[in-house]
Design a protein with these regions (language model features):
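Gly/Ser/Thr-rich active-site loops/lids in small-molecule metabolic enzymes
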Residues: 1-5, 10, 76-84
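Active-site activation/catalytic loop segments of kinase-like enzymes and analogous catalytic loops
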Residues: 2-36, 52-67
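Residue-level recognition of alpha-helical structural elements
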Residues: 20, 41-43, 70-73
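All-alpha amphipathic helical-bundle segments outside canonical DNA-binding/catalytic cores
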Residues: 37-49
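ATP/Mg2+ or Mg2+-diphosphate-binding catalytic cores
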Residues: 56-95
Length: 95
């Protein structure tokens, strides 16, 4: 469950290399309107976000460098690498 939530935030929660707190809050509020996160899931969000970011970065590398080399998209995985260095406090919205 929380991996999907983390993947959604990786895909839609960033703008120009910056995680957007309001997008995280909206995503979480929508999710929790249907299904509340457990305390264990809340605590795991930073690790799941990192895992989701790495997963997308690895997929982009495989797709655009190894499987179907494409000069235009070959460096897209680096966006995910850069995100790994950015700190984001999920606990501000995770209550």
């Amino acid at each position: 469950r929380i991996f999907d939530l983390a993947m959604a935030f990786v895909g839609f929660g960033w703008l120009d290399g910056v995680p957007m707190q309001n997008r995280w809050e909206a995503l979480l509020a929508g999710y929790e309107s249907v299904n509340r996160l457990s305390d264990v899931e809340r605590a795991a969000m930073p690790a799941m976000h990192r895992y989701a970011t790495l997963s997308i970065g690895a997929w982009r590398y495989w797709k655009h460098v190894m499987r179907e080399p494409d000069v235009e998209f070959a460096d897209r995985y680096l966006e995910m690498v850069d995100r790994l260095e950015v700190q984001f406090d999920f606990s501000e919205a995770v209550q």
